[in-house]
């Protein structure tokens, strides 16, 4: 059984960013909530949209920050502090340039890889990087100078379909993670590639 108590989906706020690659983490949390017939509601004290799920008999909070990406740690730290949730009880879903669309991977800890949302969360959790991550592949534009425009752009439908399929599999693997353990969830998710 997993000890995850908070699942966060990283995003930029507002309709103009809703369909951009950088919001893939929020797409995952929205899909997870939908699969349990829940919706997220804005809760200003946590600087985001929140919900509460019973996942495999465990009480789990969901959070999509309404801060800009580079301030995501403010929301995560507010909720973690209020509910006394430790970093290793947090799963952060985020877009990942180093994975192709259609692939998602779980991991514990590590650096921020240049991701400003992860960078701020690590900082606001007292420079503690030891939280779980769900890395949702969005691909890479091939040139570092094009990354900002790429993550703030909308994927073409062919890529969106692959990302959505990986997110659906990640939702199924989250249930395995909660019922069983991280290793079983990782083994299944890491074997998946949307085609």
From Swiss-Prot:
Entry keyword set: Cytoplasm, Hydrolase, RNA-binding, tRNA-binding
Enzyme Commission number(s): 3.1.1.29
GO cellular-component term (any): cytoplasm
Protein name (database record): Peptidyl-tRNA hydrolase
GO BP terms in the entry: protein quality control for misfolded or incompletely synthesized proteins; rescue of stalled ribosome
Keyword hit for Cell inner membrane: no
Ligand binding (tRNA): 17, 68, 70, 116
PANTHER family: PEPTIDYL-TRNA HYDROLASE
Gene name as annotated: pth
HAMAP family: Pept_tRNA_hydro_bact
């Amino acid at each position: 059984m997993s000890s995850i108590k908070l699942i966060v989906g990283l995003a930029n706020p507002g309709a103009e960013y809703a369909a951009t690659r950088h919001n893939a983490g929020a797409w995952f949390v929205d899909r997870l909530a939908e699969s349990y017939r829940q919706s997220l509601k804005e809760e200003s004290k946590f600087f985001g949209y929140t919900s509460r799920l019973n996942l495999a008999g465990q009480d789990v909070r969901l959070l999509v920050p309404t801060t800009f990406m580079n301030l995501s740690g403010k929301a995560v730290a507010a909720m973690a502090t209020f509910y006394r949730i430790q970093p290793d009880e947090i799963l952060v879903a985020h877009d990942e340039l180093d994975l192709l669309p259609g692939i998602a991977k779980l991991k514990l800890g590590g650096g921020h890889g240049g991701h400003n949302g992860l960078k701020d969360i690590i900082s606001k959790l007292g420079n503690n990087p030891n939280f779980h991550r769900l890395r949702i592949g969005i691909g890479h534009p091939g040139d570092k100078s094009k990354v900002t425009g790429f993550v703030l752009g909308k994927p073409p439908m062919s890529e969106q379909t692959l990302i959505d399929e990986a997110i659906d599999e990640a939702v199924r693997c989250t249930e395995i993670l909660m019922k069983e353990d991280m290793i079983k969830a990782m083994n299944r998710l890491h074997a998946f590639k949307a085609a």
